[in-house]
């Protein structure tokens, strides 16, 4: 797991990625248009509204975001994942430039020793439970997700990864929780302090992932839906940016705010998790970028961007290139963008598509006939 400590920021250059899980561009923009205050808060950023993710789920999206390297079932996924997190060329470059790398999330667990030297905030956890009754309740829910009558299934839904968060760390340090509320509460309580040296932070938050908990003010409510969770994600993001501004480290930070993939929401915002995914609908994430010392009104670009382009843009941003100039593609350019699709938990069989048009247009997302199956 990774320890909580989102507070140190350096007076040198920082590189900060805030990943809001499962925020879909189309739904996001509906929320954006209801909130004129967002535009002022996201000044200095360029919003890329025609961005394609590479995959429909977090596990494969995140390594692509930080490495630009596609996973095609040619090796065990864990081998690929460890290689990317430990030795991706971008991370190697940052280390050579004396960046301290930290990664905040609570989903990934690695064997002891595997990730040594990768991030400075990893904690070893013992698998002892701090709340056995809660654990038992969650196990019963998990069984219910599979065997309960259909009507009861929504009541049984919870994020199975929360089982992991019941582990104790050796010194009882609190592990980072990806829940929007936990991060938001920490932001309100803690000051960001100056430290020497260059910092890279990758912060993975729940965003608008199921189950839906939050209203726009990040209160846990019973009738939360996908849209209120997008609002809560923005509330948390804006509070974080304000903290960086207050601490005087906003200008000298490259800041990326993105989602790892979109979401295929049908009709009204539904509050039960989708388990029978459509073929498509998750390929259109959000992407905000701010370069070093940018100072301008919020701007939108329709350039046809793919997540495989991100790492190339990171290097340019660190060199001082502005956010509207960090990709080689410009608005109006035509290109085909790759998308590897698999069904939920069916990553052994990936089907290649090409997006021949606008990222959000499913009618132009065409299968190429290529598939990538696990050996």
Range-by-range predicted roles:
Residues 1-375:
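Catalytic domains that recognize anionic headgroups
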């Amino acid at each position: 797991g990774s320890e909580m400590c989102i507070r140190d920021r350096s007076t040198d250059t920082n590189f900060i990625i805030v990943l809001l899980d499962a925020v879909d561009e189309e739904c996001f923009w509906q929320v954006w248009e209801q909130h004129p205050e967002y535009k002022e808060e996201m000044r200095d950023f360029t919003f890329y509204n025609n961005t394609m993710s590479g995959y429909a789920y977090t596990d494969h999206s995140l390594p692509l975001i930080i490495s630009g390297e596609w996973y095609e079932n040619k090796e065990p996924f864990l081998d690929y994942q460890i290689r990317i997190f430990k030795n991706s060329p971008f991370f190697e470059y940052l280390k050579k430039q004396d960046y301290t790398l930290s990664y905040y999330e609570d989903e990934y667990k690695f064997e002891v020793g595997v990730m040594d030297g990768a991030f400075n905030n990893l904690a070893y956890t013992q698998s002892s439970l701090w709340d056995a009754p809660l654990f038992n309740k969650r196990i019963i829910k998990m069984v219910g997700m599979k065997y309960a009558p259909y009507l009861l299934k929504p009541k049984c839904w919870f994020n199975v990864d929360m089982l992991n968060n019941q582990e104790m760390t050796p010194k009882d340090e609190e592990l980072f929780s990806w829940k929007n509320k936990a991060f938001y509460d920490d932001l309100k309580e803690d000051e960001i302090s100056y430290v020497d040296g260059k910092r890279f932070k990758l912060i993975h938050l729940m965003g608008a992932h199921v189950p839906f908990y939050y209203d726009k003010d990040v209160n846990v409510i019973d009738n939360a839906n996908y849209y209120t969770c997008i609002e809560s994600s923005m509330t948390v993001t804006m509070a974080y940016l304000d903290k960086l501004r207050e601490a005087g480290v906003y200008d000298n930070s490259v800041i990326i705010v993105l989602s790892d993939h979109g979401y295929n929401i049908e009709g009204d915002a539904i509050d039960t998790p989708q388990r029978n995914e459509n073929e498509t609908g998750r390929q259109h994430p959000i992407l905000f970028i701010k370069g070093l010392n940018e100072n301008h009104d919020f701007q939108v670009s329709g350039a046809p961007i793919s997540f495989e382009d991100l790492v190339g843009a990171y290097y340019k941003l660190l060199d001082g290139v502005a956010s509207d100039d960090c990709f080689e593609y410009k608005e109006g350019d035509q290109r085909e963008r790759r998308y590897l699709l698999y069904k939920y938990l069916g990553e052994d069989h990936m089907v290649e598509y090409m997006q021949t048009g606008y990222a959000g247009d499913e009618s132009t997302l065409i299968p190429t006939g290529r598939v990538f199956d696990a050996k």
